[in-house]
Amino acid sequence: MELSSPSKKTTTSPINIPGGNRDNLIIGPHSHSFKTDPFSSNNSSLLSKISTNPSLESPFSSKSLLDCSPVQAVKKSLESEAKTHSLDEETNEQTDVKILNIADFPTDELILMISALLNRIITANDETTDVSQQVSDETEDELLTPILAFYGKNVPEIAVVQYLERIQKYCPTTNDIFLSLLVYFDRISKNYGHSSERNGCAKQLFVMDSGNIHRLLITGVTICTKFLSDFFYSNSRYAKVGGISLQELNHLELQFLILCDFKLLVSVEEMQKYANLLYKFWNDQ
């Protein structure tokens, strides 16, 4: 008898997931009622019931993810393009030496490390960018359409670490998925670097801040798990865990792929490099 090889299948689970039903969204409804957003919603938020205010400290600029020292002061503007350098330029001769064992490192600790890094980035960017101004002035810019899709009407109150822990609790995954998120975010920041405004000043198109980080995380985990893992869940489950509607998650998947230029492959060497730099960041802070 011929046996066919098993194909990848989405999985579901009957466990109860609090705070994510069809009428109540954890991170609130989508922000845009203008024509670039076909999925606006009037659903209410459960933030006050399930979250606490995050404590965000320390600066990171809105350049590449790991390209600043933990004690560096926040830049007052994003015009110093000459000083902007990518994560690749931060690697040294010891990059290939394994510092963090991706396979065996505790996922809970990795989530804490990634959350600390992301908190630094979004705290700095919250101080240097005006999301409302960007949304109101640039809605006609085709380059910004996939970026603006990740902004909600209100800034979610749930902390990044709590959000990642929630994802891991109800849609458990592995370390390589979380590390790949850093790679994707860094690629997007490079793909959507600086553009010239009307006044001739340079402007960073893609900026991770408190207004878009939650949608970026749940969408990134959804896409990355499907691409890298043999085991993943249905979009309806990811949407419920992430606190957004299924329709919106489906839309955000495409926007995320556009931001990444549909390039999702991450080599072992690249992932290990990011893991080592993350570990170094954690020990230095």
Curated annotation (Swiss-Prot):
The modification Phosphoserine is found at residue 69. The PCL7-PHO85 cyclin-CDK is inhibited by PHO81 in low-phosphate conditions. GO terms for molecular function: cyclin-dependent protein serine/threonine kinase regulator activity; protein kinase binding. Keywords: Carbohydrate metabolism, Cell cycle, Cell division, Cyclin, Cytoplasm, Glycogen metabolism, Phosphoprotein. One of its GO terms (biological process) is regulation of glycogen biosynthetic process. GO terms for cellular component: cyclin-dependent protein kinase holoenzyme complex; cytoplasm; nucleus. Residues 1-42 are annotated as: Disordered. Induction: Cell cycle regulated, with a peak in mid to late S phase. It is found in: Cytoplasm. Pfam families: Cyclin (PF08613). Residues 1-14 have a biased composition (Low complexity). Cyclin partner of the cyclin-dependent kinase (CDK) PHO85. Together with cyclin PCL6, controls glycogen phosphorylase and glycogen synthase activities in response to nutrient availablility. The PCL7-PHO85 cyclin-CDK holoenzyme has GLC8 kinase activity and phosphorylates and inactivates the phosphatase PP1-2 inhibitor GLC8, causing activation of PP1-2, which then dephosphorylates and activates glycogen phosphorylase. PCL7-PHO85 also phosphorylates MMR1 and YJL084C. Belongs to the cyclin family. PHO80 subfamily. Present with 3390 molecules/cell in log phase SD medium. Forms a cyclin-CDK complex with PHO85. Interacts with the substrate proteins MMR1 and YJL084C. Interacts with the CDK inhibitor (CKI) PHO81. This is PHO85 cyclin-7. It comes from Saccharomyces cerevisiae (strain ATCC 204508 / S288c) (Baker's yeast). The gene is PCL7.
